[in-house]
Curated annotation (Swiss-Prot):
<dbReference type="GO" id="GO:0051393">
    <property type="term" value="F:alpha-actinin binding"/>
</dbReference>
<keyword id="KW-0597">Phosphoprotein</keyword>
<feature type="modified residue" description="Phosphoserine">
    <location>
        <position position="906"/>
    </location>
</feature>
<feature type="compositionally biased region" description="Basic and acidic residues">
    <location>
        <begin position="663"/>
        <end position="674"/>
    </location>
</feature>
<feature type="modified residue" description="Phosphoserine">
    <location>
        <position position="551"/>
    </location>
</feature>
<feature type="compositionally biased region" description="Polar residues">
    <location>
        <begin position="595"/>
        <end position="611"/>
    </location>
</feature>
<dbReference type="GO" id="GO:0003779">
    <property type="term" value="F:actin binding"/>
</dbReference>
<dbReference type="GO" id="GO:0005829">
    <property type="term" value="C:cytosol"/>
</dbReference>
<feature type="region of interest" description="Disordered">
    <location>
        <begin position="1041"/>
        <end position="1064"/>
    </location>
</feature>
<feature type="modified residue" description="Phosphoserine">
    <location>
        <position position="548"/>
    </location>
</feature>
<feature type="modified residue" description="Phosphothreonine">
    <location>
        <position position="626"/>
    </location>
</feature>
<dbReference type="GO" id="GO:0015629">
    <property type="term" value="C:actin cytoskeleton"/>
</dbReference>
<feature type="region of interest" description="Interaction with YWHAB">
    <location>
        <begin position="607"/>
        <end position="811"/>
    </location>
</feature>
<comment type="similarity">
    <text>Belongs to the synaptopodin family.</text>
</comment>
<feature type="modified residue" description="Phosphoserine">
    <location>
        <position position="274"/>
    </location>
</feature>
<keyword id="KW-0009">Actin-binding</keyword>
<feature type="modified residue" description="Phosphoserine">
    <location>
        <position position="604"/>
    </location>
</feature>
Amino acid sequence: MGTGDFICISMTGGAPWGFRLQGGKEQKQPLQVAKIRNQSKASGSGLCEGDEVVSINGNPCADLTYPEVIKLMESITDSLQMLIKRPSSGISEALISENENKNLEHLTHGGYVESTTLQIRPATKTQCTEFFLAPVKTEVPLAENQRSGPDCAGSLKEETGPSYQRAPQMPDSQRGRVAEELILREKVEAVQPGPVVELQLSLSQERHKGASGPLVALPGAEKSKSPDPDPNLSHDRIVHINSIPTNEKADPFLRSSKIIQISSGRELRVIQESEAGDAGLPRVEVILDCSDRQKTEGCRLQAGKECVDSPVEGGQSEAPPSLVSFAVSSEGTEQGEDPRSEKDHSRPHKHRARHARLRRSESLSEKQVKEAKSKCKSIALLLTDAPNPNSKGVLMFKKRRRRARKYTLVSYGTGELEREADEEEEGDKEDTCEVAFLGASESEVDEELLSDVDDNTQVVNFDWDSGLVDIEKKLNRGDKMEMLPDTTGKGALMFAKRRERMDQITAQKEEDKVGGTPSREQDAAQTDGLRTTTSYQRKEEESVRTQSSVSKSYIEVSHGLGHVPQQNGFSGTSETANIQRMVPMNRTAKPFPGSVNQPATPFSPTRNMTSPIADFPAPPPYSAVTPPPDAFSRGVSSPIAGPAQPPPWPQPAPWSQPAFYDSSERIASRDERISVPAKRTGILQEAKRRSTTKPMFTFKEPKVSPNPELLSLLQNSEGKRGTGAGGDSGPEEDYLSLGAEACNFMQSSSAKQKTPPPVAPKPAVKSSSSQPVTPVSPVWSPGVAPTQPPAFPTSNPSKGTVVSSIKIAQPSYPPARPASTLNVAGPFKGPQAAVASQNYTPKPTVSTPTVNAVQPGAVGPSNELPGMSGRGAQLFAKRQSRMEKYVVDSDTVQAHAARAQSPTPSLPASWKYSSNVRAPPPVAYNPIHSPSYPLAALKSQPSAAQPSKMGKKKGKKPLNALDVMKHQPYQLNASLFTFQPPDAKDGLPQKSSVKVNSALAMKQALPPRPVNAASPTNVQASSVYSVPAYTSPPSFFAEASSPVSASPVPVGIPTSPKQESASSSYFVAPRPKFSAKKSGVTIQVWKPSVVEE
């Protein structure tokens, strides 16, 4: 169409027509279409904004005022016919869309097509800008053919020089390569701010076998380095972008360029159509759509023929181009993935024009994504380049965007590196050129263009206002990843600080790994012993780790932490923390830790987990550790003698931070605490610590007190309790029979008390009392060891023999303490005398109860319920006083209580009552009515005689302990009450005699297993030791006794009682330290009636 072409447009259907008019005679302006609604009748009929209305339904509009035109339009009801005059500078949207569709259809036949639509921001004032597009042939004959086509009026120029060469490898038949030159020439004739144009070219290059990606160089642009001093002077700027294939031969070739001048308001379509001879050339189409009131004739250039088809019409554009779209199609090549389009979602500014890839088969989801992107783009463009830049919404948007950018931290991620890797994988990467024409505008487009950090394409920026052409190469930015951008603010500082601290922490960890020297220097004498112990413990910890993986308990975790630090100092602490971290915090019910352990080994693992004290007493440590016997005797005997006595090696604070938290994980600053989440600990573990701090019952001194017979019945029926060593192999069965949940509860209570022992002597006492609870779990056999170490300190030295015997009754510690032979005998006598026959060892039995009852404060702590304090203790005391009112026979009750004091653990799990020892239980015997209960007096007739002897000595205090035990029946250990072999009864009488003799006798007897009562007890886990029939536990005891007690104990009973108790404890694992929670020990009150055959 020529300039001022007239077009007749008809619409039917009645109002609304979907367009708005402006002007009129009164305004001395022609009547024009001011606005057209999308998807309206006007837009569908091809009406465009800026069209001049000549007539409406045959009524000329030149002499009509605007109100008259409105009346005329309102009078039209059915059909509307308009004659419009369209200026040559504009082109109808319908025609544009048709042209685009035709072009795209034509291009898709060739293969992969990429299209991009970009916005060109109009300038406030018009200016003349010229673009020069010049395709070039590298061969001379082709260059000569370029003149064959008709020239566009005054817009075609010839040039030679650097060019944008796009020369894909041609078939061998082709004599040369064809390069495509894109020369952008700008002619500025006015100072007014110009339009902002962003042009992105993505050209996919065909790659043959030997082809490789082209290298892109950006030469030239020297002409435009400095702004034009004279604003009125028109000047040209040319930017040459050369893309030269790497496989290009060195042979020279001629370059000639044809420049097509495009005025700012014209449509240019340059198509390189591959013909038979040019199969390797891709097709490029660039469409410049004109803005309102502008019309452009397409200038069609066929690269193969090098001819320009259509002339460029003259005429000045009133506004710069509003739309630029181009498509690149590569024929005969594989579809190339556009790396940028894949990463559009990660780019910060999504309103930038992108390459929309048109595939032959596009999924519905992809189409939806494209639609969503186009919508977002349109919204973003409206915001960044609004028709009215001073509108309130646009200003608010700009303000908020500036604020957001100011307070937004730059991501320090490695997305750039990942993107490079992705691009390398793509078969044929396309070379992308980005040309940005920047003019002064309020849309902040320069921010949008230059802020795309993820883009590694070449960007050429033209700023017509300043006269500068900024060429920014955004090539591989991997080297810049090391440098943080210039960011300020709290976030950046926090990040930097945190990274420094993390580096320091990692460095410290590495140093600790390399040199495991303890941070705190210890005395020279202690250092050697500690080193040996540490090495041993490390080995032990490894074994424990493997064994305890099947059965881990709360006690195990907490004690393991506390234990290692004590022996190792800080290095030990870090080691422990690592172990703790390795140990899963799963709190689901599991078999007790000791259950998996082997008879001899279990003790060591338990000790490791439970407490440092336990480690020393345990037999394996003795044999493995180098320290002199004195140290061992000191470590073992001193705990027994005085609970308050700390172990010889240095101990950190009871639960110092190192125990629970790795020092490296302690974060000081608040920011770091926020950025690094705190290490999570299980709810149960936290509850355990809390309970340790504030137990319902505070047992200052564990006493050996009779357990309610109900508990004894439960455990006996299960046949799980092997006293002392007996608990080793039996523990698995015992724990399982109790039930996973019950076991967990028992462990948790013991763990609470255990935790303190490693910390301080008092904790040690608590641990001893809690250790009985541990016995419920395999802790008794292998795991109790940790518990027992606290027990040693708990027992008083003077009453150590009796107390230790009771403690030995506890299965867990017996292995740890081989020394207490007297103790072992005592506990055996106690239970035997009470249950089996008082005649055999009435005195020992009495003495044990006496210690328990009479010395609750001193001896009681270790054997009996310790002096209880706290609200729970008060409640129990009240209940006890109430119970006494209803006791049928107070003497009988007292007798039973005294009998109960004899440690039940002394009865071996394998021990069975002989006819001598027991009387058959009544047919209707109910454990609830056991002597410990007031009503039990009626049913406890057979054992009444025994209680009478032992019971008188102990009166109401044993009842208290029993009451406590009653309230915590779930904590009883069935393993304490296992009666299997009848051999035990023989061992019992002998054992009492052995106890009288001396610890040495016990030691001697233990290794021989058959000869002495102690040995049968240990080996057979007979009545006293309640060691089920475990031969290995005896061996373990013998082993422990020989290293520990053999060297230190040889002295004699006076000096050896403690050692003796320790060795016997190894053999007699049953130590009768009992807290209310240690129902296992309480079970000591064995009644013949309760016995199961």
